[in-house]
Regions:
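DPxDG-like acidic metal-binding loop motif
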Residues: 102-129
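Short pre-catalytic strand/loop immediately N-terminal to key active-site residues, enriched for Gly-Thr
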Residues: 88-101
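N-terminal, positively charged, Ser/Thr/Ala/Gly-biased leader segments
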Residues: 1-57
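Gly/Ser/Thr-rich beta-alpha loop segments that engage phosphate groups in nucleotides
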Residues: 22, 27, 101-107
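FabD-like malonyl-/acyl-CoA
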Residues: 40, 128-136
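Start-of-domain marker
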Residues: 62-63
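Globin-like tetrapyrrole-binding proteins
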Residues: 70
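Thiotemplate assembly-line natural product biosynthesis machinery
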Residues: 73-77
Length: 136
């Protein structure tokens, strides 16, 4: 099977307001963002395997550990049985630097969710989607 190729665009915060802390330890924020023509490329295909395979390659892939947003997303989707036991090979070609404030990791997870929704891998209401993304 051929890879599906998607782009995961970087975002720039035009306005950012920190409004306290959440129980998770993360900050509660309100932000106005704009997307720019700078992106990671993500290759996705179904595999016949027991587990998902996730690979990060490219100049900004060094140091990405197993506790990344793509792995977290797939773990949550598996736990909720939203992927119907289907496994995927996902290759992320990192062009967006880590921890640069450009949203690389979270934007990657978001692009994968958008891809799965467009391919009707699962259906999800806006409310359920909001709850899902809070866990990543």
């Amino acid at each position: 099977m051929k890879f599906n190729k998607i782009k995961s665009y970087a975002k720039i915060n035009l306005s950012l307001s920190v409004n306290g802390k959440l129980k998770s330890g993360y900050h509660k924020i309100e932000s106005l963002v704009s997307f720019v023509n700078y992106y990671d490329e993500i290759l996705i295909k179904k595999i016949k395997n027991k587990n998902h395979k996730i690979q990060f390659i490219g100049k900004f892939s060094k140091g990405i550990n197993k506790n990344n947003t793509v792995s977290k997303l797939l773990d949550i989707l598996d736990q909720k049985k939203m992927l119907n036991n289907q496994k995927y090979l996902i290759k992320v070609i990192k062009n967006i630097p880590q921890k640069s404030g450009l949203g690389g990791g979270s934007i990657n997870a978001s692009a994968i969710i958008k891809f799965f929704l467009s391919k009707k891998v699962f259906n999800c209401s806006k409310n359920n989607l909001k709850n899902l993304t809070k866990k990543i």
